[in-house]
Regions:
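Conserved phosphate/anionic-ligand binding catalytic regions in large, soluble enzymes, centered on
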Residues: 49-64, 117-137
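Glycine/threonine-rich beta-strand-loop-alpha-helix active-site module
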Residues: 56-113
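Gly-rich Lys/Arg/Thr-decorated short loops/hinges at beta-loop-alpha junctions or inter-strand turns
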Residues: 6-19, 108-113, 137-146, 161-167
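Alpha-helical scaffold segments in soluble metabolic enzymes
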Residues: 28-36, 57-61, 106, 110, ...
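Short, ordered loop/turn segments at secondary-structure junctions
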Residues: 4-8, 50-53, 73-85, 142-143
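Long, structured ligand/cofactor-binding scaffold of large enzymes
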Residues: 1-70
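Terminal amphipathic helices with adjacent charged low-complexity linkers/tails
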Residues: 76, 135-158
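Conserved small/polar residues in nucleotide/adenosyl-binding loops
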Residues: 171-173
């Protein structure tokens, strides 16, 4: 079973009313995680976290079920998109009428890079490191890119770890 959690990006909501919902969204994620795990039908769980709301929310929700083996898997860092200077140059050129709206939209679309944590070392990345330090991530997984062979290997390792922990918990019952 895969469960989804609502998420907001406070990087996008900066300076808007939605920014005030940042911590509330973390609590909603925690409750959603607890609800998903509350059915008592799981032998273990793997939580896939990415940002500074989702990771703590998943962790808080999982702590409600301390008897359930849970392994956290980080998303890893986003690949770099269009450099800021290039984006700024396209915006300036558009403002001067030197490039078309289509070229502006193309540059803006390249600004958002893809899956993974934000490309700056903010709280999303530090949350992944903290989870690794606490031992709930597979060691070394925090900064492996999402679409790499190594990421796939870490994902397989996370599943194997969840199964091993579950087997150990059954032995001690």
């Amino acid at each position: 079973m895969a469960g989804g959690v609502p998420a907001m990006c406070d990087g996008i909501t900066q300076g808007r009313v939605g920014m005030e919902l940042s911590l509330m969204s973390r609590d909603v994620i925690a409750m959603s995680t607890a609800i998903a795990l509350s059915h008592g039908v799981y032998d273990s769980a793997i939580c896939l976290g990415i940002c500074d709301k989702i990771i703590p929310g998943l962790f808080i929700g999982a702590l409600s079920f301390g008897y359930l083996p849970v392994v956290f898997m980080p998303a890893g860092p986003m690949s770099s998109g269009l450099p800021n200077e290039e984006k700024a140059n396209v915006r300036k050129a558009f403002a001067k009428g030197e490039v078309s709206r289509e070229e502006l939209i193309k540059a803006e679309s390249k600004a958002y890079h893809g899956e993974g944590t934000c490309t700056f070392y903010g709280t999303a990345n530090s949350n992944q490191i903290i989870m690794e330090i606490m031992g709930v991530h597979i060691p070394g997984a925090a900064f492996v890119h999402p679409n790499s062979d190594l990421r796939h290997a870490y994902n397989v390792l996370a599943v194997e770890q969840a199964v091993k922990i579950n087997i150990l918990s059954l032995i001690h019952i």
